[in-house]
Amino acid sequence: MFNDIVIGPITIHMYGVMIAAGFLAALLMTLRRGKKRGYDEDIIWGIFFCAIIGGMLGTRILYYIVEIPEIMKDPFILWDFKNGYVVYGGIIGGILASYIYCRTKKQAFMPYFDLVMPAVSFAQGFGRFGCFFAGCCYGRETDAWYGITFHNSSFAPNGVKLIPTQLISAAGDFIICALLLWFASKRPKAGRVAAAYLVLYGIGRFAVEFLRNDYRGSVGVLSTSQLISIGAVIGGIVLYFAAPKLAGVGNVAEEKSVG
């Protein structure tokens, strides 16, 4: 939409600005909530940096997995860092890296998992605004009043009205964040806020995928993200009921409920 803002010799890429804003907002939210609830600030910082590294690696690794057939035809795709970042890969990579970090620090993972997930959803909302500015993750053509038209996008078709899937996703992410914060205020068992995120995000992402029209890989009639969404929902349901037993397994830190 308006991804590049040129000020003299400086070009500001709004996609990058939104990603950075999302990371910063997520960190500040987590630090603020963690401080109120007595969480170790150093651990939060550690999780934040590990999640960024794991998340960035995850986005690329899942992209490579999805694009194996194309990579076999053109190996140079491996070195194309301008494109190819899969959100679900970032979520999986960030969670895995954070888990490993908590294990090395002998901290219970579930309480911190709960603490950060509302902020993760908030950051995703910013990221989807970045997608809107760049024109990626675009929707199907529509004649509806809410359709948007891109004119200078390197990703979306220009000059035709499209369903604003990026804005729909952003709204969904912010709503999920609000719901998770409300749920966390009820002091549920450790692990259940994160479980709720997996279920809510999985359902929302599965639905939005039907509205998208960008190429993103498929498994049969479902997109790769829809298949992962099904796994996320199932995993979230299992985690919700297993959370009381899993919260302190293999950790020495005291279990906490995030409020």
Predicted regions and their residues:
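A feature for loop-to-transmembrane-helix boundaries and adjacent hydrophobic helices
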Residues: 1-259
